[in-house]
Design a protein with these regions (language model features):
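Positively charged, polar, low-complexity stretches
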Residues: 1-111
Length: 111
């Protein structure tokens, strides 16, 4: 199966230096330009990723590609939180046709 992601609107969720859920939510809110009412919890993140009305404008028609970088340290220090985050990202992709999420490998990429 092949999918062309070339035209997707891409944003980078850089988790370098993020050590907790609060930091992850703040980064996500910033890079996705989420509204002030974004609840900064797992359910709100899932809802926002699945709701194209809160996506950056170019992504609504073209689709959204979220590239997650620098996630290794967060995953190592917070394995439970990382498991939840990765489950949320996976579920959002499963629910939303125009959404793709990629984990950038590099450094200590141990999945």
């Amino acid at each position: 199966m092949s999918e062309d992601l070339a035209d997707r609107y891409a944003v980078t969720l850089d988790l370098t230096g993020v050590t907790d859920k609060t930091g992850l939510m703040e980064r996500a809110a910033h890079v996705l330009d989420l509204p002030e009412w974004f609840g900064r919890n797992w359910d709100a993140l899932l809802d926002s990723l699945c709701d194209t009305t809160v996506w950056p404008t170019p992504a609504v028609e073209r689709g959204l590609l979220v590239v997650v970088r620098g996630w290794h340290t967060f995953a190592e220090k917070n394995p439970r939180e990382w498991r939840i985050a990765s489950d949320i990202l996976s579920e959002a992709v499963d629910r939303t046709f125009l959404l793709d999420v990629m984990l950038a490998l590099g450094g200590n990429a141990h999945l």
